Amino acid sequence: MIDIAVRDLKKEYEVGQPVLDGLTFQVDTGERVGILGRNGAGKTTLFRILTGQEEADSGEVILSPGKRLGLISQIPVYPAGYTVEDVLRTAFDDLKAMEAELHQISDQLGSGDKDLLARYDRLQAAYEAGGGYEIETRLEKICAGLGIERAFRDKNFADLSGGEKTRINLARLILVDTEILLLDEPTNHLDLNATVWLEDYISHYKGTVLVISHDRYFLDRTISRVVELKNGRAEFYAGNYSFYAVEKERRYLEQLRQYKKEQAEIQRLSETARIMHEHNTEHLNKRAFSIEKRIARLNQTARPEERKKLKAKFGQAEFHADDLLSLREVNKAFGSQVLFDHVTLRVEDGDRIALLGDNGAGKSTLLKIILGEEPQDGGTVKQGLTVKVGYLPQQIRFSHPERSLYDTMLYEAGCNAQQARDRLGKFLFQGEDVFKPVSVLSGGEQSRLRLCMLMDEKVNFLILDEPTNHLDLDSREWIEEAVEEF
């Protein structure tokens, strides 16, 4: 049975620059589909069209009748004063309405009205089937899985950060228990435990799932088919992300081989036609014209597009000591909340250290203490004399977002004009894009720009706080390779 049918969708925001250009595909009931594509390929636009938030210029979307569809990135507006608990419980509004009607009817059952009794039976069956008797159990289970603690549930929803709102909305969406889930970057604001929990939830979910994600490990564990948006249309891969990556490269090499074969044939035919024209006989000219028509048909095949990759590497400063960093008995608290106590750590040249912990455990705070941006309450932090730190923060900010990318490299990265162009080009900022203001960049583009500023610095100690947040799949693969080579 088909849950979603997309037929010849077209959408453009600027005349002559289509985002979707005849997009056609279908999703069967129970499928787990990854929606992939470069930044700007139209993935989020597609989701917004599926949910009715935007209208396509033409084409149609057909959803299976009666199926409910939920989108994680769609954060509704709630009444002023709503707490996290209130927002989560809106998932049960329909069940609560049924419960209220059941109570109302039960007070009238003594009348012996058969129609009323039949209505009560139907409502009770629907209430039970919808999980009405399991509301509290489901709420506690999902909050535990996504790390939403009891005290956090008392906070005002309006006061939460964008990431926190997204996590609460994910929990609410799961509680609603829709038949079709649309997940747009669901792991961006989840810690490791919550991500593992979400993977397990999806594996047991009985409905249909469409996922946009730049986390290839998450994709490998949650999807069984890929729809890639490319030039406004769909390309299909019957497997998870690992299959997609291998198959995409195989297709590219096969298309390139075919293209080169055709170009060689065009060259041979062109030379044959040229010689025939030189003889300038009626018979040979006719044959030459026939060959030239054949060449025109062959010339319609475009060279397959090679995937652009980032090419920069971290600059490396010399280091003349064993200890880059030492922490001894470091502790930190905010009021009565102790983040960590008696932290002792020694970092030596060549170490690769992962800092793990639940959301709120103090990972970013510890990094800020190491960098001198946050004072510790006790203990000592010492850096080696020749340490040169390269730091990528979790929240990317620029001191002058009104500046263009080009000017940012000139004034904040100390580049001359040619260096600015060259370094931006290595990070796939080319042509007129370098004159866009930083303020209009997407989260992924801002991360790339910050990395561009960082990469040519001579550093010997990298501190990366959630470095893959907002980066696309290619950029994530690149940063892994760059760190491995550092």
Residue ranges and their predicted role:
Residues 105, 112, 130, 269, ...:
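Hydrophobic stripe of amphipathic alpha-helices that form coiled-coil interfaces
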Residues 1-255, 259, 308, 317-486:
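ABC ATP-binding cassette signature C-motif
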Residues 149, 278-280, 284, 309:
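Short, flexible, glycine-rich and Lys/Arg-enriched loop motifs at helix boundaries
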Residues 207, 278, 300-303, 460:
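Generic structural signal for secondary-structure transition and capping sites
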Residues 125, 276-277:
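Charged, low-complexity surface segments at secondary-structure and domain boundaries
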Residues 248-272, 284, 288-302:
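Intracellular alpha-helical coupling/juxtamembrane segments of multi-pass membrane proteins
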Residues 9-11, 271-275:
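Short N-terminal helix-initiation segments at or just after the protein's N-terminus
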